[in-house]
């Protein structure tokens, strides 16, 4: 995942490789994992974002140098990665002080039905400055980075996963004076993916019934709803007709 010549289908960095929606693709057999018996093939696509979330959570735990069940956690974003971070923290890492933030009321409601954590809008007074030990920014906007640095406790950790805006202002003074650890993370290791398949096949993260399935010819409509902020479901999987 740290390879400078990494190739991802449908991505253009670091090397462009189109084909994310191709009917057939050719990949090295070393990149193929056998589907566990207990994992439904319709739910299997969630393994990829789950591995991303697991990698991020464990990077944060390593940097924080203490168990995540003894920390105050803030998750920015209620999409698939944000919800999966919450599920991993709650059900696998046994964290019990988590706040998930999203401006989309519909998405907050969807996340709330699958998490025991607080799900709040960004302007809620419970989102305090200098309070959270670790923050997961799954959005990657300038405003979410600014909110992260405001809310993180001295000596805390910010895990930056989202890629919405690649640049912008950031309070480097606080980051420097209060020894904030900022980690960018993308993708996962083979070990992360294997661990993810085990978690999913053993239902550690729950039933995954928050996934919504739509026909492939409804894909453009789904992307528009996500872009417009009118989509409530954290994850849509397109099924070929």
What is each PLM-predicted segment?
Residues 22, 70, 131-132:
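Local beta-strand N-terminus motif with an aromatic residue
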Residues 117-124, 213-218:
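Short acidic-hydrophobic, aromatic-tinged amphipathic segments that line or gate anion-handling sites
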Residues 75, 136-137, 160:
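Redox-cofactor binding/interface segments in oxidoreductases and associated redox assembly factors
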Residues 1-32:
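Glycine-rich phosphate/adenylate-binding loop and adjacent beta-alpha elements
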Residues 126-135:
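A short acidic, Gly/Pro-enriched loop at the edge of an enzyme's catalytic core
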Residues 146, 190, 194-241:
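C-terminal hydrophobic helical "lid"/dimerization subdomain
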Residues 39-122:
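Mid-domain Rossmann-like dinucleotide-binding core that forms the NAD(H)/NADP(H) cofactor-binding site
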Residues 143-202, 239-241:
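Glycine-rich phosphate-binding loop and adjacent beta-alpha segment
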């Amino acid at each position: 995942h740290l390879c400078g010549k990494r190739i991802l289908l449908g991505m253009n960095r670091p090397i462009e490789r189109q084909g994310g929606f191709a009917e057939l693709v050719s990949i090295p057999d070393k990149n193929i994992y056998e589907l566990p018996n207990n994992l439904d093939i319709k739910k299997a696509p969630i393994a990829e974002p789950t591995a991303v979330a697991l990698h991020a959570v464990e990077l944060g735990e390593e940097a924080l140098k203490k168990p995540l069940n003894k920390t105050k956690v803030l998750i920015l974003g209620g999409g698939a990665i944000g919800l999966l971070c919450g599920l991993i923290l709650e059900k696998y890492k046994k964290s019990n002080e988590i706040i998930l933030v999203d401006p989309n009321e519909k998405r907050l409601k969807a996340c709330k039905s699958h998490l025991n954590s607080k799900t709040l809008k960004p302007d809620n007074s419970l989102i305090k400055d200098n309070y959270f030990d670790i923050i997961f920014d799954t959005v990657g906007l300038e405003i979410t980075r600014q909110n992260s640095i405001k809310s993180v406790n001295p000596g805390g950790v910010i895990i930056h996963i989202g890629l919405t805006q690649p640049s912008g202002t950031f309070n480097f003074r606080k980051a420097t004076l209060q020894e904030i650890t900022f980690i960018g993370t993308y993708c996962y290791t083979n070990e992360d993916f294997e661990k993810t398949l085990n978690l999913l096949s053993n239902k550690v993260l729950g039933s995954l019934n928050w996934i919504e399935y739509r026909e492939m010819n409804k894909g453009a409509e789904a992307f528009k709803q996500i872009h417009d902020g009118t989509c409530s479901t954290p994850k849509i999987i397109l099924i070929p007709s």
